[in-house]
From Swiss-Prot:
Its EC number is 4.2.1.20. The beta subunit is responsible for the synthesis of L-tryptophan from indole and L-serine. This is Tryptophan synthase beta chain. It comes from the Bacteria. InterPro entries: Trp_synth_b_CS, Trp_synth_beta, Trp_synth_beta/beta-like, TrpB-like_PALP, TrpB-like_PALP_sf. The lineage of its organism: Bacteria, Pseudomonadati, Bacteroidota, Bacteroidia, Bacteroidales. Transmembrane segments: none annotated. PANTHER family: TRYPTOPHAN SYNTHASE, TRYPTOPHAN SYNTHASE-RELATED. It comes from Bacteroides thetaiotaomicron (strain ATCC 29148 / DSM 2079 / JCM 5827 / CCUG 10774 / NCTC 10582 / VPI-5482 / E50). It catalyses: (1S,2R)-1-C-(indol-3-yl)glycerol 3-phosphate + L-serine = D-glyceraldehyde 3-phosphate + L-tryptophan + H2O. GO terms for cellular component: cytoplasm. Its cofactor is pyridoxal 5'-phosphate. The modification N6-(pyridoxal phosphate)lysine is found at residue 90.
Length: 394
């Protein structure tokens, strides 16, 4: 049977690998040779599970959304990652990676962030574990996510606004990598998504796989079977999607639907629909689909959602799309906003703009009444209230 998980060289099919500058080769090799031994050790698992339970508040609920189910003619469950401490799925990964960094003897943590959720989650765990924390964030994102910036500062992190390029997630990642090049000995770079050189995509997917592990148990309790008919998640880099599908990736009974950011429309050039528009390239150390021009220069992506405007895609998802294991839909800004308002009015849950893209995919799908569908609400919408309000006023 074909496996959609990573091979020993860090590839998912033809996607992935580790293309890094020579100065970082030693750091990436050290990480590659260390991560599995630590993640699979009993003492790590014990500490990780205890923190997920007592600090994050896991397991996150699997909620049967009755009014949404009625509207879309199926049994619609929401995996409530928005209810985690810090308000998103990101903390599952930051706890795991910072526990790893501590075991590797690193004293300084650096991170990139787009919507600010990964930055807040990193700053939170650094405060908990008494580690120095530096977060790189594009100036555009600093302005549109200022509440998260203030939270990071309150938690003791240094937030560095990045003024190169489009001043968004890609540029923040570039600066974080530059910092890592300058401080390879004492610094651990914590990537927030399933992107970057191997072993990051696999490590982040493993740490987020607690999501699908819980879905299996929760569905068994609620439905008497451990698998849904469909899983739906939004993808930027792809960490919440990877966590949602991890334990089902090789299970042909389960349909995988990924919603990427269509922006103002995939034909407009103002988009972040990487899987649909990207060509094979290398970005931040991985071979994957990249939005690029005819000369191979990376194009600036656009999305109303700060967490989805990335011009690449995690290699795990690029491979799923290439092998037709996943259905990929582009959801435009206005469709996502409309879906967020719909969830709020039907179920009393205000989702993050990123999660709203997964909800926006529902109108593009047809379900049977007996279908069991699980959609991951990756984060809560507090950080996006101003965007929702300004869009509604138009």
């Amino acid at each position: 049977m074909k496996s959609f998980l990573v091979d020993q060289d860090g590839y998912y099919g033809e996607f992935g690998g580790a293309y890094v500058p020579e100065i970082l080769h030693k750091c990436v090799e050290e990480l590659k040779n260390t991560y599995l031994g630590v993640l699979e050790s009993e003492d790590f698992k014990k500490e990780f599970d205890q923190l997920l339970r007592d600090y994050v508040g896991r397991p996150s609920p699997l909620y049967l959304a009755r009014r949404l189910s009625e509207k879309y003619g199926c049994k619609m469950y929401l995996k409530r990652e928005d209810l985690n401490h810090t308000g998103a799925h990101k903390i599952n990964n930051t706890i795991g990676q910072i526990l790893l960094a501590r075991r590797m003897g690193k004293k300084r943590i650096i991170a990139e962030t787009g919507a600010g959720q990964h930055g807040v989650a990193t700053a939170t765990v650094c405060a908990l574990m008494d580690m120095e924390c530096i977060v790189y964030m594009g100036k555009t994102d600093v302005e549109r996510q200022h509440i998260n910036v203030e939270k990071m500062k309150m938690l003791g992190a240094t937030v560095i606004p990045v003024t190169s390029g489009n001043m968004t997630l890609k540029d923040a990642t570039n600066e974080a990598i530059r910092d890592w090049c300058c401080h390879p000995a004492d610094t651990y770079y914590i990537i927030g998504s399933t992107v970057g050189p191997h072993p990051y995509p696999d490590m982040v997917a493993r740490l987020q796989s607690v999501i699908s592990e819980e879905i299996k148990k929760q569905l068994m309790e609620k439905e008497g079977r451990d698998h849904p008919d469909y899983l739906i998640a939004c993808v930027g880099g792809g960490s919440n999607a990877a966590g949602t599908i991890y334990h089902y990736i090789n299970d042909g009974r389960v349909g995988i639907i990924l919603a990427e950011a269509g922006g103002k429309g995939i034909e407009t050039g103002m988009t972040a629909a990487t899987i649909q528009l990207g060509k094979m390239g290398i970005i931040h150390g991985a071979r994957t689909y990249v939005i690029q021009n005819e000369d191979g220069q990376i194009e600036e992506p656009y999305s109303i959602s700060a967490g989805l405007d990335y011009p690449g895609i995690g290699p795990i998802h690029a491979n799923l799309a290439a092998q037709r294991r996943a259905t990929v839909l582009a959801v435009n800004d206005d469709e996502a906003i409309e879906a967020a308002y719909e969830l709020t009015k039907l179920e009393g849950i205000i989702p993050a703009l990123e999660s709203a893209h997964a909800l926006g995919a529902l109108k593009k799908l047809k379900f049977k009444p007996e279908d069991v569908v699980v959609l991951t609400v990756s984060g809560r919408g507090d950080k996006d209230i101003e965007t929702y309000l300004s869009f509604n006023e138009k």
